[in-house]
Amino acid sequence: MVNTEETHYACGLKKEDFQTTIDGKKTDLYVLRNAKGNEVAVTNYGDAIVAIMVPDKEGKLANIIQGHDNIQEVISSPEPYLSTLIGRYGNRIAKGRFQLNGKEYKLAINNGPNSLHGGKEGFNAKVWDAVQVNDHAVVLKYISSYGEEGYTGEVEVWVAYSFSDNDELIIKYSAKTNKKTIINLTSHGFFSLAGIANPTPTIDDLECQINADFYLPIDETSIPTGEILKVAGTPFDFREPKPVGQDIDADNEQIKNGAGYDHCFVLNKKEEGELSFAARIKEPKSGRTMEVYTTEPGVQVYTHNWADGYKGQHGATFPRRSAICFEAQHFPDSPNHPYFPSVILEPCKEYTQRTIYKFGVEK
């Protein structure tokens, strides 16, 4: 049974601060707590994760994900994708155009000449139907109408967040459509393993490992060039752990194009769709670690290159490069690159994805 009387959470957030009505739909806060007393807090506006409370090597709990502490700030955030659920299409589509069955579709343009993260009002800006099924899990649903942001087909999307007693945040996605369309869902968590603060520390000393021999180079508008290049001998080689800041400002065209890291890594997979290790980070001072596992073929690594010190939960501030994102997904602009893994969803098929963020401590 869900404890509906509990109002004092370790994360310090209050349900009433997340309750409002938008276009006739109610928003709320859903707190998932495991047997250790650690927490994940989610709101059904954009499925935003607004707190992840896990201990450091001394056992001290802290929030390690960037977000806001009330619904109005979530809605008006300077970073509209801050730890939200992204769709219909995570990442960019060049010039907002793609073809399907010989017909060209034109999407909303919202990032230079391109369409980013589903358009001007993607899934991150929608109120989802939500049911907290127990103390550990919440299930959310959204129906994306035909023509929304220029996409074809009506799509029904289900997302389940669960938080295990092993400190695993498990995100399961599924979707169905009534007409052939494209889809690429992801979670855009902004992780700060040192703990959010005023100011939140940079990620320069964060030790990072990424299970990828290849990455996708981008042009000056952050669209993949179509090449798939080896990471060896480049700033993108994270096959062995190294500090994020070691090469983040390297004299490298790709680093300059992304203003740091904002690239899709092609994950090493034994077979398509397997749940496998993608990445690991460790924050040396706190000892906190996070491992990423996913069924997706790629992970977009973003190092918060455009933040300017805006405010978050409990007076925290988020300077440039104070978070890192691991957006498990299919490749950017896949509809315009036939040899990239397919993002087409047929009416007779179901889209599924699973990504796990596992938190731990290493002394």
Predicted region positions:
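An exposed, glycine/acidic-rich loop-and-rim segment of catalytic or binding clefts
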Residues: 2-363
